[in-house]
A protein has these predicted regions:
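FIC/Doc superfamily catalytic core
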Residues: 1-348
Length: 348
């Protein structure tokens, strides 16, 4: 079994590009406290929206779907799950809420990770959660002709317990020593977790929950207000490319963590930029809702979609956004471009 190194390997990752990304995130974190203190009411809205978006996106990445209406009902606990997909969505909501409410007291130890996995499947039948895989698994990919091939072979089932113990022990040693920036350590831990692939099912969703937990513990709580899972969903191909690049040679200890670390730092930067933008838009609540939508369009260079407007104005209903866009097109203030999912709007 390979060694888990969180001392020497991270030091090799401190390239000028990664150092610049880390420094930028530190700056955003400094401003984060000011936003949190000054915008309490606005943040409540962002929190509620992000909870729904995170739950939906993380499950969709794994092919678990329900309607938008059912998703909102499940996340707000106004409905009971009706099928397997909804059971898994409800379980994700439970674990995400646990992390949001008590991340300071949750440490990434094997027994805790097993408990979180148990809760992930708390609505599911058959006792799928709370124990490591009982058979070897393979991460496969399907080519253009529909043929499957092994992309990565994780740690065998009989070594999983030992691998998780060692991973968590070495990671927590480095975390507590505090010699390496936690922004670099966290993606390394997540990559190792995914290469172990400790569970029969739920590894991808657990990896994203653990990512949020660790970023929160390190003081980067932007994921509460902007869905990092949705940002990952939007860049899913890049995510899998980075994962594949960083997992090559992992068993031999010859892999490079750099692609995966850079990917996650990029997601964090994007999340902070969106957070600051959304808080700024929410400050305009004294304006009417149509005027706020108009202000969003005015501040956008190039095309903007209905979905982007709704993400920036999470407290404005879809009907109001659609009605306002229709009126602005009729008045000649904006023009509609494209068709179908790519439909957007530009200033005239």
């Amino acid at each position: 079994m390979r060694d888990f190194d969180f001392i020497v390997s991270p030091a090799k990752l401190l390239t000028p590009e990664i150092v610049q990304m880390v420094s930028s995130i530190h700056e955003h974190k400094g401003k984060q406290e000011l936003f949190l203190e000054a915008n309490v009411d606005e943040l409540k809205t962002l929190l509620e929206v992000a909870l729904v978006q995170s739950t939906g996106a993380s499950n969709r990445i794994e092919g678990i779907f329900t309607s938008d209406k059912r998703l909102e009902e499940l996340v707000s606990q106004k409905a009971e799950p009706r099928n397997r997909s909804e059971q898994e969505i409800a379980g994700y909501r439970e674990v995400l809420s646990t992390i949001h409410e008590g991340y300071e007291y949750i440490n990434p130890r094997p027994n805790i990770i097993l408990q979180l996995h148990r809760d992930l499947y708390s609505y599911s039948q058959g006792g799928a959660g709370g124990s490591y895989k009982n058979s070897d698994n393979v991460i496969a990919e399907t080519d253009a002709e529909g043929h499957q091939k092994a992309r990565f072979i994780p740690v065998p089932a009989f070594q999983t317990d030992e691998a998780m113990e060692e991973l968590c022990a070495r990671f927590l040693e480095a975390w507590e020593a505090d010699r390496i920036d936690k922004l670099v350590l966290i993606p390394m831990f997540i990559l190792d977790f995914l290469c172990i692939h400790p569970f029969n099912d739920g590894n991808g969703r657990m990896s994203r929950l653990l990512t949020l937990l660790l970023f929160y513990k390190a003081g980067y709580i932007v994921g509460k207000y902007v869905s990092m899972e949705m940002l990952i969903e939007k860049t899913k191909e890049t995510y899998y490319e980075a994962l594949q690049a960083s997992s090559t040679g992992w068993h031999e200890g010859e892999n490079s963590y750099e692609p995966f670390v850079k990917y996650y730092l990029g997601i964090m930067l994007k999340a902070y930029n969106e957070f600051e933008s959304r808080v700024e838009h929410l400050k305009h609540r004294s304006l009417s809702k149509p005027d706020r939508i108009k202000a969003v369009i005015d501040n956008k260079v190039g095309k903007i979609t209905k979905k982007e407007i709704m993400e920036l104005c999470p407290d404005i209903s879809k009907i109001t956004v659609e009605r306002t866009l229709t009126n602005l097109v009729k008045s000649g203030y904006i023009a509609k471009v494209g068709a179908g999912p790519s439909t957007g709007y530009v200033r005239v």
